[in-house]
Curated annotation (Swiss-Prot):
Gene Ontology molecular function: any one: protein tyrosine kinase activity
Protein name (Swiss-Prot/TrEMBL): Dual specificity protein kinase CLK3
Species whose genome carries this gene: Mus musculus (Mouse)
Phosphotyrosine PTM sites in chain numbering: 7
Catalytic residues of the enzyme: 283
């Protein structure tokens, strides 16, 4: 049976200017976890003159979810943001495509090192016909230059390319030490800051592996890691597409409610496990949630008079722990990708596990409607959107924040007659207004989302409480079980 080999690759991680740099503060730089934005010119501001409801369906969803100008401005600078790549990443990074092998004339751009063999002489002679004898080579940006048919560690045979990002690249390999099992091998650039960030992620993945020996908590587990001539390499199981990529390829048709319910239950289950082990993911978004198998069937939607893709298996895995933070570690001021960032982070009031709960609420809305709930890239506008959709920000949060420049006499400073103000007024409405139906299960979903989107993190529902919510009463026994046949042991 065909199994999709693509991993996630939303788009590159670049920032358009230092103004929009997000995740790590300068205090984290000395810990090796500061991410650096690429130097790009800011994109043109989107038009604010049209009502959201009057924009044609596909155009509106492109503007509200897939627009590169928005998804690049406030991306998480996690080095693993393209941990599970796909062909989309290669199309969006023309300037970063691999250069061909350098000639001697251009050898000064490359760092060449003689390949070392860890096998015995007899093993080398037996496998010499399979392995390339050429030297290890990096391009000028520190990416490992590799081709299909190359081997790493005399164990991993490269059979395909899955994507490339700021952090490095992901290739599909056959693991000859485990019966030619298929793996996704993440190869980090030979650059100090990315190498150190990879070590931090490996540490988190090792902790998860220790706590989840039975592989039942739905986190992507690391099967192996090694240092290949300065390139940190992490091997993962090969999974399907990420949930955003599938949504995009389905023309942003929302997921059916039963699919939303099953994915929501798995998300709450996985993140409760992390939270119980004093770990906050901090970068939850549809790109970091992968289908185990993204095979689909095509169905005709009579209501919309179009064909839709319906994924056959809604089992998911949570990925990208490059920004995960333990309770005892330093908590940087800014975390989470803009669209999924909670108010306590914007107001710089400190954050903890409830940060992830807010992100899940935003993700569920996106699954349900096909576009993001908060489509913005600026703090003040983001807060105004929150108030339009969820009600007023609690006064005690306003009094505590250092960001008093956003407020005057206890209210947000905002000009509703500006183009931005008119856009927010026309396109943001109370949360329940987005319900597609008034049936009980839709009402229950919106009740769960509203409790996840409480302004005050102390009042926000916990994931242990969320798993008991009536919305999940409609799950089948099979959907409530978490069986795993994975064997990620090294």
């Amino acid at each position: 049976m065909h199994h999709c080999k693509r991993y996630r690759s939303p788009e590159p991680d670049p920032y358009l200017s230092y103004r929009w740099k997000r995740r790590r503060s300068y205090s984290r730089e000395h810990e090796g976890r500061l991410r650096y934005p690429s130097r790009r010119e800011p994109p043109p501001r989107r038009s604010r003159s049209r009502s959201h409801d009057r924009i044609p369906y596909q155009r509106r969803y492109r503007e509200h979810r897939d627009s590169d100008t928005y998804r690049c401005e406030e991306r998480s600078p996690s080095f693993g943001e393209d941990c599970y790549g796909s062909s989309r990443s290669r199309h969006r990074r023309r300037s970063r495509e691999r250069a061909p092998y350098r000639t001697r004339k251009h050898a000064h751009h490359c760092h060449k090192r003689r390949t070392r063999s860890c096998s015995s002489a007899s093993s080398r002679s037996q496998q010499s016909s399979k392995r390339s004898s050429r030297s290890v080579e990096d391009d000028k940006e520190g990416h490992l230059v590799c081709r299909i048919g190359d081997w790493l560690q005399e164990r991993y045979e490269i059979v395909g390319n899955l994507g490339e990002g700021t952090f490095g690249k992901v290739v599909e390999c056959l693991d000859h030490a485990r019966g030619k099992s298929q793996v996704a091998l993440k190869i980090i650039r030979n650059v100090g800051k990315y190498r150190e960030a990879a070590r931090l992620e490996i540490n988190v993945l090792k902790k998860i592996k220790e706590k989840d020996k039975e592989n039942k908590f739905l986190c992507v587990l690391m099967s192996d890691w090694f240092n290949f001539h300065g390139h940190m390499c992490i091997a993962f199981e090969l999974l399907g597409k990420n949930t955003f990529e599938f949504l995009k390829e389905n023309n942003f048709q929302p997921y059916p409610l039963p699919h939303v319910r099953h994915m929501a239950y798995q998300l709450c289950h996985a993140l409760r496990f992390l939270h119980e082990n004093q770990l906050t993911h901090t970068d939850l978004k549809p790109e970091n949630i992968l289908f185990v198998n993204s095979e689909f069937e095509t169905l005709y939607n009579e209501h919309k008079s179009c064909e839709e893709k319906s994924v056959k298996n809604t089992s998911i895995r949570v990925a990208d722990f490059g920004s995960a933070t333990f309770d005892h570690e330093h908590h940087t001021t800014i975390v989470a990708t803009r669209h999924y960032r909670p108010p306590e982070v914007i107001l710089e009031l400190g954050w903890a596990q409830p940060c992830d709960v807010w992100s899940i609420g935003c993700i569920l809305f996106e699954y349900y409607r096909g576009f993001t709930l908060f489509q913005t890239h600026e703090n003040r506008e983001h807060l105004v959107m929150m108030e339009k959709i969820l009600g007023p920000i609690p006064s005690h949060m306003i009094h505590r924040t250092r960001k008093q420049k956003y407020f005057y006499k206890g209210g947000l400073v905002w000009d509703e007659n500006s183009s931005d103000g008119r856009y927010v007024k026309e396109n943001c409405k109370p949360l329940k207004s987005y319900m597609l139906q008034d049936s009980l299960e839709h009402v229950q979903l919106f009740d769960l989302m509203r409790r996840m989107l409480e302004f005050d993190p102390a009042q926000r529902i916990t994931l242990a409480e969320a798993l008991l919510h009536p919305f999940f009463a409609g799950l089948t026994p099979e959907e409530r079980s978490f069986h795993s046949s994975r064997n990620p042991s090294r």
